[in-house]
């Protein structure tokens, strides 16, 4: 094993901790992004509860090996930054795709979802998946729809009776 200085070992430990504890993580290249745009992107991510960290590839490689992930070797080439969340597993993927549209120069290198390596191609596909809240809303709609239909069907005869009685009342009032 390569000998690593204590301060760098601390960085490797921090990276390993982020990888272990994050619900979702995207690795990306930010080559061509201005420092002003990088600061704006970090602020935007922070507002959304995400963290962006620029990392050294050699230290990232050590952390990934310690975790035991089989990743694409291209991850360790060029500039690398991490985007991760400890709360929502899909948020890093969705917000990364938004940032790609906004800045254009960002390129996905891959990601981690539920402890599994995600290729760069899969990052876009995962970003299109509905989030937890959207799935809950869809489930509520699916469950409540038959009940609403049943209520409508059962209340139909009573509603018709009320209309008939109203018509009789109006007819008697006109006759009187």
Swiss-Prot record:
Enumerate the SUPFAM superfamilies for this protein: Ribosomal protein L10-like
Question: Which Gene3D superfamilies does its entry note?
Answer: 3.30.70.1730, 6.10.250.290
Can you name one GO molecular function term for this protein? large ribosomal subunit rRNA binding
InterPro entries in alphabetical order = Ribosomal_uL10, Ribosomal_uL10-like_sf, Ribosomal_uL10_bac, Ribosomal_uL10_bac_type
What is one GO cellular-component annotation here?
Answer: ribosome
Q: Name one Pfam family in it.
A: Ribosomal_L10
Keywords for this protein: Ribonucleoprotein, Ribosomal protein, RNA-binding, rRNA-binding
Q: Which GO terms describe its biological process?
A: translation
Query: Per its database record, what is this protein's job?
Result: Forms part of the ribosomal stalk, playing a central role in the interaction of the ribosome with GTP-bound translation factors.
- Complex and partners: Part of the ribosomal stalk of the 50S ribosomal subunit. The N-terminus interacts with L11 and the large rRNA to form the base of the stalk. The C-terminus forms an elongated spine to which L12 dimers bind in a sequential fashion forming a multimeric L10(L12)X complex.
Identify its protein family.
Answer: Belongs to the universal ribosomal protein uL10 family.
| Protein name as annotated | Large ribosomal subunit protein uL10
């Amino acid at each position: 094993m390569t000998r690593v200085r204590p301060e760098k070992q601390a960085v490797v430990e921090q990276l390993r901790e982020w990888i272990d504890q994050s619900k979702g993580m995207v690795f990306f290249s930010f080559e061509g992004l201005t420092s002003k745009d990088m600061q704006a992107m970090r602020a935007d991510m922070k507002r959304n509860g995400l963290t962006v960290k620029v990392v050294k590839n050699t230290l990232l490689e050590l952390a990934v090996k310690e975790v035991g992930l089989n990743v694409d070797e291209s991850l360790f080439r060029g500039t690398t930054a991490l985007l991760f969340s400890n709360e929502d597993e899909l948020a890093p993927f969705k917000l990364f795709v938004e940032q790609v549209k906004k800045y254009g120069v960002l390129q996905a290198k891959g990601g981690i979802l539920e402890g599994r390596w995600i290729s760069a191609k899969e990052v876009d596909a995962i970003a299109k998946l509905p989030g937890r809240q959207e799935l809950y809303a869809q489930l509520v709609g699916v469950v409540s729809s038959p009940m609403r239909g049943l209520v409508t069907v059962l209340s139909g005869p009573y509603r018709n009776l009320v209309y008939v009685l109203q018509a009789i009342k109006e007819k008697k009032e006109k006759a009187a």
